[in-house]
Curated annotation (Swiss-Prot):
InterPro entries: AB_hydrolase_fold (IPR029058), NDRG (IPR004142). PANTHER family: N-MYC DOWNSTREAM REGULATED (PTHR11034). Belongs to the NDRG family. This is NDRG-like protein. The lineage of its organism: Eukaryota, Amoebozoa, Evosea, Eumycetozoa, Dictyostelia. It comes from Dictyostelium discoideum. Pfam families: Ndr. Transmembrane segments: none annotated.
Length: 326
């Protein structure tokens, strides 16, 4: 088991530029797909690298609460230091149910649980004819991808979990969150749901370190159907516990990423201790909260590249990139 503490922590990130969009997809390089699953429709966005290699690795991302794939992952994938490897990747972003722009409200009785969302990933793989993939999950999205990897271990060769607390809440935390959540008037006052998310997940760090990014998250959150946003939070709070023996049994390579200023840092470090020490690594990013992919994307680009190389991908990239440098 290894731990990476950022040696480039003194490097200052340039301001994050996340385009707040008011239409379905603002990236012309992404293609929108609708996948029918057992529990309803999933909207996915695919970005295929220009290399077109038959061995091109597939990255499947799943975003955190209150976000969509644009807010959560575009600062990372659009970072200048990622330009050299994007041609070598097949990226599929899964939007949580009903989190695409202009989505219809999903009735609470039909909104899937975290376990059901994990099961529905198999429909995405079948649709895109993907056999194996590397999962990139932020927060709740990491829980979903981890649960899927327990169900279908042969399909997952690597997991990058960013700020993800996999274990369910303790009884006391569950009651506290449940009381707070059930008092939110989701239908009459959608701002209550958004305020809950901002206060509990992002404001503690971003108000001081990156207020512009916090404003972007708030504006983007308004574009998500408020009832579906509430349902996603509700499913996360009520998620089934993943047992310690299930976590230890994970056979894929795992990179756990946590911001050192995150409220949940200790929980994530405790989670790291439960992974198999032979295939897990933790990366602690200084001066950063829970949303590392947006706050400090440049700090995780190189560890991500090395992680991919360690599981046998991007070897052509390294060879060609080294040749170009020479």
């Amino acid at each position: 088991m290894s731990s990476l503490n950022k040696s480039i922590g003194s490097v200052t990130e340039s301001p994050i530029n996340v385009v707040v969009h008011n239409y379905d997809n603002n990236d012309p390089t992404e293609t929108r797909h609708e996948v029918q699953t057992k529990h309803g429709k999933l909207v996915c966005f695919q970005k295929i690298g220009s290399n077109q290699s038959p061995n091109m690795p597939t990255i499947i991302s799943y975003h955190d609460l209150g976000l969509n794939h644009t807010t959560c992952f575009s600062p990372f994938f659009n970072h200048p230091n990622m330009n050299h490897i994007l041609p070598y990747l097949n990226i599929i972003h899964i939007e949580a149910p009903g989190h695409e722009f202009n989505a219809e409200t999903i009735p609470s009785s039909q909104y899937p649980s975290i376990t059901e969302m994990a099961e529905d990933i198999q429909y995405v793989l079948d649709y895109f004819k993907v056999k194996v993939f590397i999962g990139l999950g932020a927060g709740a999205g990491g829980c979903i991808l981890t649960q899927y990897s327990i169900f279908y271990p042969r399909s997952v060769v690597g997991l990058v979990l960013v700020g993800s607390v996999i274990k369910s809440f303790s009884w006391l935390d569950w009651v506290k969150s449940w009381v707070e959540l059930t008092t939110l008037p989701s239908l009459k006052n959608p701002t209550g749901v958004r305020k809950y998310l901002i206060d509990h997940y992002y404001a503690d760090n971003l108000e001081e370190t990156n207020p512009d990014l916090l404003e972007i998250i708030k504006k983007e959150m308004v574009l998500i159907n408020p009832d579906n946003l509430y349902h996603y939070v509700h499913s996360f709070v009520k998620r089934d516990d993943i047992k310690e023996e299930q976590i230890k049994a994970l056979g894929c390579k795992i990179l756990l990423v946590v911001g050192k200023d995150s409220t949940y840092k200790e929980d994530i470090i405790d989670l790291f201790s439960q992974f198999n020490p032979r295939n897990s690594t933790i990366l602690q990013v200084p001066d950063c909260g829970i949303l590392v992919t947006a706050e400090k994307p440049g700090d995780i680009v190189e560890p991500f590249k090395l992680f991919m190389q360690g599981i046998g991908f991007l070897l052509d990239y390294y060879q060609s990139h080294d040749d170009a440098q020479k």
